[in-house]
Amino acid sequence: MTENVNSSGDSAIKSEDKEEVTVIQEGQAKVGFHGPVFYNPVQEFNRDLTVTVLRQFSADHQKWAEEQKQLKTEEEPPKKKNKLAINEDGKIRILDALSASGLRALRFSKEVPNVGFIMANDFSDNAVASIQENVKLNGVEDIVEAHFGDAVMTMMEHRGIDKRFHAVDLDPYGTASTFLDSAVQCVADRGILMVTCTDMAVLCGNTPEACYNKYDAVTTRMKCCHEVGLRILLRAIDSAANRYTRYIEPLVSISVDFYVRVFVRVHTGAFQAKQSGTKVGTVLVCSGCHSMEPLVLLKRGEGNQQSKYSIPTVRHSISGPGNRCIHCLLPLHQIGPIYLAPIHSKPFVTSLLERLKSTPEAERLGTHGRLQGVLTMVNEELDDVLYYEHNQMANVVKVSVPKSQSVRSAILNAGFKVSGSHCNPRAIKTNAPMHLLWDIYRQVAKDTSVDREKRLAKESAGYHILGQPITNTVNFTLHPGAIEQAKKENLVRFQCNKGKNWGPRQKAKGSVNSTKAGFQLTEHKE
């Protein structure tokens, strides 16, 4: 078998039967294509992010495993050691459950240190054959195993404590909801589960009935829909884990391009799993002015009552008479349930950034600049639930859109926190109350002499908002914290997505729809 470079810049392999195979290199891995195997070059950022996260996870796991070995005694039962997934060599096991060409598995084997075994699984004969060829092409036969099987069945076969994986990657075409139940069972304690979903129309509220069927939640179209989608997915994963006395710790949650991607650590513990009810809830959303208020499902007792939980008393801050918004008097909607706890681990994200900054230029990944920019924004994000768009709020009251720095400064000068969001370049994420936010725009309207009687219809949301008095002192003086660090450093924060072939690619022919996974089996060709 010989390899040559073709006119397009890719490589071409000519096998003994004279068949030409296109070879593409990404990172340190090469993959050859000559059949209907799914590959999307636009997802290079997704794969680079996964490699970066796994490198940090592997380093953390090795350090933790060494600490556990030092604490280990001769009388310690082996069952506990198996539960914690401590290998004698400290190496990790990875499952690429929907492997397609095997590119992810190959990159993990060549770019992530301390990896002992990788299972590259797929339910397509063509894909498995391609994985086997690519494993040989990259010379990683001692690490990567091509495996034919339904992803759900494969994960269920590895739910035993001594068979679990330290890292499980789910990157399906569309939703990952059908794989979550089996995935949370086959991850080792303190292991990492990495999940992608590309059904953004569902997660962003275009079809609430489909969202309910897939994720057991409902939502509507709103400016912060991408963060809502992330929180819906996290809640679905945590709910699946809770059934097995497990719970999740979100490490990084990203919404970019045409998909959401979450990295969560899976823990085991009945006491902590019960606390999940305090981390989820619904959100009241105004149909007029878009004001929001999260409502937690359960509250935990205090003092000696911490083991007891109760349903909290309903105290709405934006709901008035007739279940209408107190700011604009228009109806309220309720979305959820969603995950209300923090969706990022700031110490983990800081470690990722330090790793990226210390990487020599010659060893940097293909999307290094974008990784640094997005993770810097993530690290600056407040943990407060959801965000507003400053231009949307200005549009409600029909005033000229103020500069984002001016709005941020007014919030900071009032003594509250504010940040942007990696999901949206116009996002305002803050812990300030809604009345202060509307006071800011009432002040803008006052400064620009906006006449609500002439500019706004009397039944509109903006008319009612401008009719209320300003009760807070609004100071637009530039605050030092109003400019984001990522912007100061001129980092790549938001990618232009309108290039050729951008978006999810067509599903490979012969692949099995996720809705049929586990319900039909075909004879595998050995």
From Swiss-Prot:
PROSITE patterns, per this entry?
A: SAM_MT_TRM1
Recorded catalytic reaction(s): these are: guanosine(26) in tRNA + 2 S-adenosyl-L-methionine = N(2)-dimethylguanosine(26) in tRNA + 2 S-adenosyl-L-homocysteine + 2 H(+)
What keywords are annotated for this sequence in UniProt? Answer: Metal-binding, Methyltransferase, RNA-binding, S-adenosyl-L-methionine, Transferase, tRNA processing, tRNA-binding, Zinc
Annotated GO molecular function terms are:
tRNA (guanine(26)-N2)-dimethyltransferase activity; tRNA binding
Which residues are noted in the entry as S-adenosyl-L-methionine-binding?
47, 104, 122
Polar residues bias: start-end ranges? 1-10
Q: Which GO terms describe its cellular component?
A: nucleus
Q: Which residues form the Trm1 methyltransferase domain?
A: 22-441
Q: InterPro entries attached here?
A: SAM-dependent_MTases_sf, Trm1, tRNA_met_Trm1_C
Q: Does the keyword Metal-binding apply?
A: yes
Question: Which SUPFAM superfamilies does the entry mention?
Answer: S-adenosyl-L-methionine-dependent methyltransferases
- Looking at the record, which segments are called Disordered? 1-20, 498-526
UniProt: Zn(2+) binding residues: 286, 289, 325, 328
Q: What does this protein do?
A: Dimethylates a single guanine residue at position 26 of most tRNAs using S-adenosyl-L-methionine as donor of the methyl groups.
Q: Which family does it belong to?
A: Belongs to the class I-like SAM-binding methyltransferase superfamily. Trm1 family.
Q: Any idea what this protein is called?
A: tRNA (guanine(26)-N(2))-dimethyltransferase
Organism for this UniProt entry = Caenorhabditis elegans
